[in-house]
Amino acid sequence: MDTDILKMQDREVFEAIALETGRQMETLELIASENFTSRAVMQACGSVMTNKYAEGYPGKRYYGGCEFVDIAENLARDRAKKLFGCEYVNVQPHSGSSANMAVLFSVLKPGDCIMGLDLSHGGHLTHGSSVNFSGQMYKAHAYGVDGETGIIDMNQVEKMALEVRPRLIICGASAYSQGFDFKAFREIADKVGAFLMADIAHPAGLIVSGLLSDPMPHCHFVTTTTHKTLRGPRGGMIMMGKDFENPMGITIKTKNGQRVKMMSEVMDAEVMPGIQGGPLMHIIAGKAVAFGEALRPEFRQYAMQVRSNAAAMSERFLSLGYNIVSGGTKNHLMLLDLRNKDITGKVVENTLHEAGITVNKNMVPFDDKSPFVTSGIRIGTAAMTTRGMNEDDSRLIAELIDRVILSAASPESSSVCRSVKEEIRSLCLRNPLEGYGVTPS
């Protein structure tokens, strides 16, 4: 990566970037929400598109001079529609959280009832957590997983929906290693007259590759991030399989009177000017590049390897005596319940960091520890697979993590971490990140 100008102009920022580059190149990234973009995506994100304000949408901007950024946004929209098989898409949300906010604002009033997966059972802050706007503006009710299987209890979901009569049901997760039965969720939503929103931020890359069930035929709204398993720049997106007249009765004036707005019009207005102003056109250009990459046949091979690596790693953890919530994985991640190892997620996260392995502590279902301590760790295989690692590497990584955990409370912990860190560094250098080289001075 060419950073000569930055190095001359701002040495402090250059050094920070160089050090972070070294960390990414020589340590193992296993945080499930992280991945490595292509150089083409990074070049688009670092392009002159960052200089252009473009409030509004292609062909209907509030600023002049938008004819070329319109090309980039139309490419992103058209490619996303082809990739996900949807009729409507908005690529302007700055994040998955802002995409979720736009959907909630478009169909809910303050005080309306919503349902989402419990944060401690693998859900997300924007699905009704009390510390988030979604749990503060709305009456949020959380469904959870079965205590024995670790899988979402659809009977509980239906019972709760019939009791609280939500306006919106959210199906999605940030730490759930199984798929979602979108058809069953839609049947429940229809019984109570609720909207259904799927948040596929984590498994989107696997879904577009046909490896997990497709939410488009069943959900009114689908949101996602554009990084994680999609391997694009950090950002969000809103989709609808089919557009429809908004059931809230919102109208728009026409030459002949007025008409009911389509839901796509309501959603676009909620994104801009509802919660955002100018879109990040350099990021939208990067999204277009990433969607183009995901449309290629080799992306499906990548997604298949991500899932295969996760399966191999989870099976090795199980054979080493670890408990995995839900008993295994069908996607790119796994949630290790460490309670039978008598160690906390916080300790494991910190100790693995010393060994050159990055994970995040994570609450497990029915956890009795705080979110700052936790009884589990979340592990994902999207980033390591981008480096070219395979099933054998995945099993080796599980064994190295086990070595670190078993020694964490012993006097040998530091020496074990040093030894594992060297093995991890060698593994990473055998599977390099092409074109990421920035050397600190």
Swiss-Prot record:
PROSITE patterns: SHMT. GO terms for cellular component: cytosol. Signal peptide: none annotated. Pathway: One-carbon metabolism; tetrahydrofolate interconversion; Amino-acid biosynthesis; glycine biosynthesis; glycine from L-serine: step 1/1. (6S)-5,6,7,8-tetrahydrofolate binds at residues 119, 123-125, 370-372. GO terms for molecular function: glycine hydroxymethyltransferase activity; pyridoxal phosphate binding. Its cofactor is pyridoxal 5'-phosphate. It comes from the Bacteria. The modification N6-(pyridoxal phosphate)lysine is found at residue 228. Its main location: cytoplasm. Its EC number is 2.1.2.1. GO terms for biological process: glycine biosynthetic process from serine; tetrahydrofolate interconversion. Coiled coil: none annotated. It is found in: Cytoplasm. It is an enzyme of class 2 (transferase). Keywords: Amino-acid biosynthesis, Cytoplasm, One-carbon metabolism, Pyridoxal phosphate, Transferase. InterPro entries: PyrdxlP-dep_Trfase, PyrdxlP-dep_Trfase_major, PyrdxlP-dep_Trfase_small, Ser_HO-MeTrfase, Ser_HO-MeTrfase-like, Ser_HO-MeTrfase_PLP_BS, SHMT-like_dom. It catalyses: (6R)-5,10-methylene-5,6,7,8-tetrahydrofolate + glycine + H2O = (6S)-5,6,7,8-tetrahydrofolate + L-serine. SUPFAM superfamilies: PLP-dependent transferases. The record marks 227 as: Plays an important role in substrate specificity. Catalyzes the reversible interconversion of serine and glycine with tetrahydrofolate (THF) serving as the one-carbon carrier. This reaction serves as the major source of one-carbon groups required for the biosynthesis of purines, thymidylate, methionine, and other important biomolecules. Also exhibits THF-independent aldolase activity toward beta-hydroxyamino acids, producing glycine and aldehydes, via a retro-aldol mechanism. Belongs to the SHMT family. Homodimer. This is Serine hydroxymethyltransferase. It comes from Chlorobium phaeovibrioides (strain DSM 265 / 1930) (Prosthecochloris vibrioformis (strain DSM 265)).
